[in-house]
UniProtKB/Swiss-Prot annotation:
It catalyses: (S)-4-amino-5-oxopentanoate = 5-aminolevulinate. Homodimer. Pathway: Porphyrin-containing compound metabolism; protoporphyrin-IX biosynthesis; 5-aminolevulinate from L-glutamyl-tRNA(Glu): step 2/2. CDD domains: OAT_like. It comes from Clostridium botulinum (strain Alaska E43 / Type E3). Keywords: Cytoplasm, Isomerase, Porphyrin biosynthesis, Pyridoxal phosphate. It holds the Pfam family Aminotran_3. This is Glutamate-1-semialdehyde 2,1-aminomutase. NCBIfam families: hemL, PRK00062.1. It is found in: Cytoplasm.
C-alpha cells in the first residue's frame, strides 16, 4: 500500500485518519506522508521518499531517530520487563538522575505524557495552596486537559478554534487568561483575583504559538506576584526541558519555579512525562499527602530505560548543545539573509535548537497578538514547497522547527537552498 491508500483506509478506522489532529494536514489542504522508518535526521514514507526531518516527533528526538544507545537500552530492558505496575530500580535511577542534575528538582513523579504532567501539577498546586483558580497565557498550550483549552495555541490556534466542544463552562471557570509578556495585564489579574489563584503555569519559551521567549522582567513579575499572593509558579518545560539547554529554559532566567513539568526528550521517543519540584510541595501527593494521582503505566521500565539512556548521553556530551546552537544560528542567519535579499517579510525567532518562521510585516514577534498577524496563506505555500523539496516541517505556522544533534551543515545548506527557491517564487 502507498501513502494515499494507507491514509484513505485509516480514515475508516480513526477519526480523520490520525490519532492527533495536526497530523492529518487538513489545514494545509493535502494528505500527509505516511512514515515508515527513520534514522538520524532522515525519515522515509511508504512511497519510498526521503525527508530531512525538522519535526523530530514534535521535539523528543534531540538525539535523532533510533539513536543506537537508546535502542540498545530499550532492547535490553524489554528482554526482562514490559510492565509490572510495581516499583523498579529503573524508575529510581531516572528519578535520582533528574533530581541530582536539574535545578529546583527535589522530588519527582513520573507520568505518561505532557498533558498528564501539567494537569497533575495544577491539581497538586490546588491541593497545596487550598485555592482553585489558575492562570495560563493566551497562545500557550499545556495539553488537552479541559481547564487548559482556552486560547490554547498549537493545533487549536492552527484551526482557528477558540476552545473545544465537550468542555463545559464549569471546567474552565477557574482558568484565568493572562497575556504573554504583558506585565500590566498580569498585575491587574492578580489585583482582582490574587487571593483565589493557586498557580500560574507558563511556557518560559512558548513553542505552540511559534517560538517566543518570555521577557526576563515578565518572568520576574510572575515570581514576585506568586510570592506576594501565595500562588505557585509552574514552568511547563515539556518542550524546552533538555532542549534549549540540558537543564532547560530555567537556565535562561534567574528565577526559581515551584513546580516544573517535563516530557518529550526525557522519554527518548517513548511516551513519558513527569512533574517535579520542592519536596515540601511534592509530598502533598498520595501516598504521602492527600492529592491523589496514579497511573498504571507510570514509571514503565522500558520508558525509564530509554529516558535514562537519552539523558545520560546528553549529560556526557555537552558539545551536543554547542553544535545544535551552531546549526540553529546558521539556519536562522541564512533564512533572514535570503528573506532580505528577496524582500520577503519574515521574522525568525529562535532559542537554541527550536525556531519558528513568522511570515509577517512586523519588526518583531513577542506576543500572542503579534503571532495572529502572520500570513497563514504564505505559510501554506512555504510548507507545500518544502515538503515537495524533501523537508519534513510542522504543518502549522504556530509550531516550532526542531534541530537534533545529527543535523549537519550539509542539511542546513540544503534547507536554505530550497527556501531560497521558495523566496524567489514569492516575488
Amino acid at each position: 500500500m502507498n501513502n494515499l491508500e494507507i491514509f484513505e483506509e485509516s480514515k475508516k478506522y480513526m477519526p480523520g485518519g490520525v490519532n492527533s489532529p495536526v497530523r492529518c494536514f487538513k489545514e494545509m489542504g493535502m494528505n500527509p506522508p505516511v512514515i515508515k522508518s527513520g534514522k538520524g535526521v532522515i525519515i522515509r514514507d511508504e512511497d519510498g521518499k526521503e525527508y530531512i526531518d525538522f519535526v523530530l516527533a514534535w521535539g523528543p528526538l534531540l538525539l535523532g531517530h533510533c539513536d543506537e544507545d537508546v535502542v540498545k537500552a530499550i532492547k535490553e530492558t524489554s528482554e526482562n520487563a514490559l510492565a509490572f505496575g510495581a516499583p523498579t530500580k529503573l524508575e529510581l535511577e531516572l528519578s535520582k538522575f533528574m533530581c541530582e542534575n536539574l535545578d529546583n528538582v527535589e522530588m519527582i513523579r513520573m507520568v505518561n505524557s505532557g498533558t498528564e504532567a501539567t494537569m497533575s501539577a495544577v491539581k497538586l498546586a490546588r491541593g497545596y495552596t487550598g485555592k482553585s483558580k489558575i492562570v495560563k497565557f493566551a497562545g500557550c498550550y499545556h495539553g488537552h486537559f479541559d481547564g487548559f483549552l482556552i486560547e490554547a495555541g498549537s493545533g487549536v490556534l492552527t484551526e482557528g478554534i477558540p476552545g473545544s466542544l465537550g468542555v463545559p463552562k464549569e471546567s474552565v471557570e477557574n482558568t484565568l487568561i493572562g497575556l504573554y509578556n504583558d506585565k500590566v495585564q498580569i498585575k491587574e489579574l492578580f489585583k482582582k483575583y490574587g487571593n483565589e489563584i493557586a498557580a500560574v503555569i507558563i511556557e518560559p519559551v512558548a513553542g505552540n504559538m511559534g517560538v517566543i521567549k518570555a521577557n526576563e522582567d515578565f518572568i520576574k513579575e510572575l515570581r514576585d506576584l506568586c510570592d506576594e499572593y501565595g500562588a505557585l509558579l509552574i514552568f511547563d518545560e515539556v518542550m524546552t526541558g533538555f532542549r534549549v539547554a540540558f537543564k532547560g529554559a530555567q537556565t535562561l532566567f534567574d528565577i526559581k519555579p515551584d513546580l516544573i513539568t517535563y516530557a518529550k526528550i526525557m522519554g527518548g521517543g517513548l511516551p513519558c512525562g513527569a512533574y517535579a519540584g520542592k519536596k515540601e510541595i511534592m509530598e502533598k501527593l498520595s501516598p504521602c499527602g492527600g492529592v491523589y494521582q496514579a497511573g498504571t503505566m507510570s514509571g514503565n521500565p522500558i520508558v525509564m530505560a530509554a529516558g535514562l539512556a537519552t539523558l545520560t548521553k546528553l549529560k556526557n556530551n555537552t558539545e551536543f548543545y554547542d553544535n545544535v546552537e551552531k546549526m540553529g544560528k546558521k539556519l536562522q542567519d541564512g533564512l533572514i539573509k535570503i528573506s532580505e535579499e528577496n524582500n520577503l517579510p519574515l521574522i525568525v525567532n529562535r532559542v537554541g535548537g527550536m525556531l519558528t518562521l513568522f511570515f509577517t510585516e512586523l519588526e518583531k514577534v513577542n506576543t500572542y497578538e503579534d503571532v495572529k498577524t502572520c500570513d497563514n496563506e504564505r505559510f501554506k505555500r512555504y510548507f507545500k514547497h518544502m515538503l515537495n523539496e524533501g523537508f519534513n516541517i510542522a504543518p502549522s505556522q504556530f509550531e516550532a522547527m526542531f534541530l537534533s544533534v545529527k543535523h549537519t551543515e550539509e542539511h542546513i545548506d540544503k534547507f536554505l537552498d530550497a527556501f531560497k527557491r521558495f523566496a524567489i517564487n514569492e516575488k
